[in-house]
Amino acid sequence: MTRLLGGRIEVICGCMFSGKTEELIRRLNHVRLARQRLIAFTPRRDTRYRLGSLVSHNGLSVEARVIDSIRDIPAYLDSDVDVVAVDELHLLDDPPDAAREVCQQLADRGLRVIVAGLDQDFRAQPFPAMAQLMAVAEQVDKLYAICVRCGAYATRSQRLIDGKPAPADAPTIVVGGQELYEARCRACYEPAQ
C-alpha cells in the first residue's frame, strides 16, 4: 500500500461513447498492479448494465458499490483504502457543490480520487457538479468520441427521440445508450430547440 502524499483528484470527462469508463477501468487496473487498495462507486441510476459494476461500452468491468449520493462514500471507506473511483458522477442526485466538497475532503486525507462523467448534457450545457470538480482537480482529461455523422472528433452528446434531436425542455437526465444518444462534433450537433 502506497498512499500518495497529499492525495489528488483526477477527472475523466467527455461526451457519450468517448471511453470515459474504459479509461477509468484502465487506471484502476494500474492501481491493482501497484497493489493499492481501491473502492469504486457507481450511481444507482445507471441501469444500463449490471448494477454493482462499472461497465464500459466494450464490456470491460470492475466491481463497484452502488450509491445514491456522493455523500454516501465516506461511510464505505476504511483506513486501508488508497484510491476512490466514481463513475458517471453526473448521474448522482446531489447539489452541484457536493462532489467538489466530498472529493476535496478525500484528497485532503491523502486519497487518490478518480472521477469519470459527462462534462455536458444533451443541450451542450455543463453539468455543474463536473464543472466544479474540474476546477479543483489536479488532473483533467477530456476524451472525445467519433462523430457518427462525419467522422470528426465528437465532443457533444446528441439525444434523439424518434430520430430527431430531443427538445430543450426534455429532462436533463435520461439514462440510455446508442438507442437514445449519438456522439457528434460541434458542426454536426443540432442544438435542442
Curated annotation (Swiss-Prot):
It comes from the Bacteria. HAMAP family: Thymidine_kinase. Gene3D superfamilies: 3.30.60.20, P-loop containing nucleotide triphosphate hydrolases. This is Thymidine kinase. Its EC number is 2.7.1.21. The gene is tdk. It is an enzyme of class 2 (transferase). It comes from Roseiflexus sp. (strain RS-1). Keywords: ATP-binding, Cytoplasm, DNA synthesis, Kinase, Metal-binding, Nucleotide-binding, Transferase, Zinc.
